Amino acid sequence: MASMMSNAAVVGRTTPAQASMVAPFTGLKSVSAFPVTKKSNDITSIASNGGRVQCMQVWPPLGKKKFETLSYLPPLSEESLMKEVQYLLNNGWVPCLEFEPTHGFVYREHGNTPGYYDGRYWTMWKLPMFGCTDPSQVVAELEEAKKAYPEAFTRIIGFDNVRQVQCISFIAYKPASYDA
């Protein structure tokens, strides 16, 4: 048992530099140094936004499904659509079209937790348009998709192939049968 014990003595020494690293406690500050404001317990002193509440409206949740980025705006004109696609191209994103023939919005079919089959993933129209530099090419593909699937929702996404993320997504076409 004596062979297991060490004869080396451990000495813990503090240096003067360690003691001066933390400022010593000097006590609490005087209360007289702080301004004192008396708070009223009267309920009428609480700020009211009653004037603003009167002009607020609640978005009706039934019959007014909304989709993605530009869904609260009226349908895009062809000129506005071209500008959005040009913005996408100016940022170096790859345009891609996707369509959904039955549900143009997120829904829960196979449970109440988010999953693969809940409307987030749409069918890709052809391949991503790598190397596309002209918005009219994207709009021409959109027209082709509308002819092939006139009752499908179609969206344009902008994909950043460097960061491997989708940067923009908006509905470019809603079927005529959908009334919002």
Curated annotation (Swiss-Prot):
Predominant cellular place of this UniProt entry's protein: plastid
InterPro entries, A to Z: RuBisCO_ssu (IPR024681), RuBisCO_ssu_dom (IPR000894), RuBisCO_ssu_N (IPR024680), RuBisCO_ssu_sf (IPR036385)
Gene Ontology molecular function terms on file: ribulose-bisphosphate carboxylase activity
Gene Ontology CC, one term: chloroplast
Family, per entry: Belongs to the RuBisCO small chain family.
UniProt protein name: Ribulose bisphosphate carboxylase small subunit, chloroplastic 2
Compartments where located: Plastid, Chloroplast
Subunit structure: Heterohexadecamer of 8 large and 8 small subunits.
Induction per the UniProt record: The least expressed of the 6 small subunit genes.
Gene3D superfamilies linked to this entry: Ribulose bisphosphate carboxylase, small subunit
Keyword annotations: Calvin cycle, Carbon dioxide fixation, Chloroplast, Photorespiration, Photosynthesis, Plastid, Transit peptide
Any one of the GO BP annotations: photorespiration
Transit peptide location on this chain: 1-54
Summary of the function given for this chain in its UniProt record: RuBisCO catalyzes two reactions: the carboxylation of D-ribulose 1,5-bisphosphate, the primary event in carbon dioxide fixation, as well as the oxidative fragmentation of the pentose substrate. Both reactions occur simultaneously and in competition at the same active site. Although the small subunit is not catalytic it is essential for maximal activity.
Misc. remarks from the entry: The basic functional RuBisCO is composed of a large chain homodimer in a 'head-to-tail' conformation. In form I RuBisCO this homodimer is arranged in a barrel-like tetramer with the small subunits forming a tetrameric 'cap' on each end of the 'barrel'.
